[in-house]
Amino acid sequence: MAIQPLRLDPITVLGKQLVIELFDCVDQRFDDIQWIEESMLEAARQANATIITSAFHKFSPIGISGVVVIAESHLAIHTWPEYGYAAVDVFTCGDVLDGAQAVRVLSERLGSRRHLISSMDRGLGGHRLGLLSRSLAGNGPVDEDSPTLRWALGQGTGVA
């Protein structure tokens, strides 16, 4: 019997990834590894994630990279304090995690004045991308009521 290729129509979503760009981060602890790790753990807790472990590394002279491994997948961060910039990924394989809450916690704790959030459905057959929320003109909070953000988090249709 010949093996038949798996047919996908068009994508079998296995997880959702939020890609968060945090700009103009002004908190003075932005290069403090313990504070960044605690911020990431707090974001995971407030997002209802089940924390498994975490690992963080401080670069010389500045910058931090780290990951919080959760039962639902992971949260990762890479900081560039010299630019006031952080790149954050929140990936979840289930529908329990509140990604908007994780983003809100990190944006507030890092003192981000501008942000850009994109979403990607990931899985078998490819991926889908979407822009969720942006505050590139200055000091705007994460818009958790955005129809696009609700859609990306599996909470709505994405239509206003």
Swiss-Prot record:
GO terms for molecular function: adenosylmethionine decarboxylase activity. The gene is speH. Its cofactor is pyruvate. It comes from the Bacteria. Is synthesized initially as an inactive proenzyme. Formation of the active enzyme involves a self-maturation process in which the active site pyruvoyl group is generated from an internal serine residue via an autocatalytic post-translational modification. Two non-identical subunits are generated from the proenzyme in this reaction, and the pyruvate is formed at the N-terminus of the alpha chain, which is derived from the carboxyl end of the proenzyme. GO terms for cellular component: cytosol. Pathway: Amine and polyamine biosynthesis; S-adenosylmethioninamine biosynthesis; S-adenosylmethioninamine from S-adenosyl-L-methionine: step 1/1. The keyword Cell wall biogenesis/degradation does not apply. Binds 1 pyruvoyl group covalently per subunit. Its EC number is 4.1.1.50. Heterotetramer of two alpha and two beta chains arranged as a dimer of alpha/beta heterodimers. It is an enzyme of class 4 (lyase). It catalyses: S-adenosyl-L-methionine + H(+) = S-adenosyl 3-(methylsulfanyl)propylamine + CO2. Belongs to the prokaryotic AdoMetDC family. Type 1 subfamily. This is S-adenosylmethionine decarboxylase proenzyme. Catalyzes the decarboxylation of S-adenosylmethionine to S-adenosylmethioninamine (dcAdoMet), the propylamine donor required for the synthesis of the polyamines spermine and spermidine from the diamine putrescine. The active site is at S73 (schiff-base intermediate with substrate), H78 (proton acceptor), C93 (proton donor). Coiled coil: none annotated. HAMAP family: AdoMetDC_1. The record marks E72, S73 as: Cleavage (non-hydrolytic). InterPro entries: AdoMetDC_fam_prok (IPR003826), S-AdoMet_deCO2ase_core (IPR016067), S-AdoMet_deCOase_pro-enz (IPR017716).
